[in-house]
Amino acid sequence: MSFKKLIFIFIFITAVSQSIADTKITSDDNHQMNFYLGNFDFSDHKQKALLVGFQHQDENLSRDTILGNVSPITGGFVTENSAAYIYTGIEWNVDMGSMVFTPSFAPGLYHEGDGKDLGHILEFKSEVQLSYEPSDTTNIGLSYNHVSHASLDDKNPGANSYMFNFLKKF
């Protein structure tokens, strides 16, 4: 997929989301931190590595849409091979009773350290997460993501990761 197509899709999704969003911004002072631990690039046996990360969600900026609850996210992770990724993006929280389905998209900056060369500093993270909500302030879940630069350069191996998540609202 070309970079121009990716930008067009991102702008289209943003415009549609804002046009159908409920204009009321939630007034709660809730923030959510997601602490996660997992396996970076588990599908590449030579490059797979342990990763640890965090993600912040500010529910003061969330909006209810027909797609579910949409909110901005910011986070990052490091691997045991000193690779690092910092990102900011958007996630959709789809409430399914005591379960929450959360797809997200976040562009960010990647530093390979002694880890895998992903081919570019600008990378895009797409993720799906399924979590269980045992209480109003705590979720535990499992997530899968793919980090890739969408063919901005010739080399584009991408990385697939899975994580165990602990989410806490405060």
Where are these regions (language model features)?
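Outer-membrane beta-barrel "beta-signal"
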Residues: K48-F54, P157-F170
